[in-house]
Amino acid sequence: MKTILSALGLSLLIFTSCGGQKKVEVDFIQDNIDNAVAQNTIQTDIIEKSGKILNPRTINKDGSISYIPIDDWCSGFFPGSMWLTYNLTGDQKWLPLAEKYTEALDSVKHLKWHHDVGFMIGCSYLNGYRMADKKEYKDVIIETAKSLSTRFRPNAGAVSYTHLRAHETL
């Protein structure tokens, strides 16, 4: 009888301890979403006040923000974060921002000298296509894939990763 009561008590302890873990996970996830929203809000406020379309990459040692051109391999990450913020929060204020920063990358679809166009267009246009049903983004995605395919080397069976200048060819 003592063994049965001990087993029952242990089972009860295990089952009750499992319930709190879910709340901790939910809080952890929500805290991270809230943090991302706060960071994106600060960044978009700064950019929108500038009157320019800027693409942040990192914070410099002096605390200033480093912005990048659209042909930088990280250029799709900021628009992608706008799409993720829109998707995670459902807040409509993020939709026009996601569209604006995504559509600023339109010319990336023609980059044939860059092997990272998948990051650039996947994070931006592809997220818009799948998260907001932006069917018009499909043409940009396909054109980008065609540009990237010009880097395919049949003998190697791979896409060339060598960066070329705009005037050079593979």
Where are these regions (language model features)?
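Flexible, solvent-exposed coil segments and beta strand-coil junctions
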Residues: 101-104
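Low-complexity, Ser/Thr/Pro/Gly-enriched N-terminal "stalk/linker" regions
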Residues: 22-76, 84, 88, 92-93, ...
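Short coil/turn connectors between adjacent alpha-helices in alpha-solenoid helical repeat scaffolds
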Residues: 131-136
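Bacterial Sec-dependent N-terminal signal peptides
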Residues: 1-26
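Single conserved hydrophobic/aromatic residue that forms the stacking wall/gate
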Residues: 163-170
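Well-ordered alpha-helical segments within folded domains of soluble proteins
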Residues: 71-86, 113-130, 165
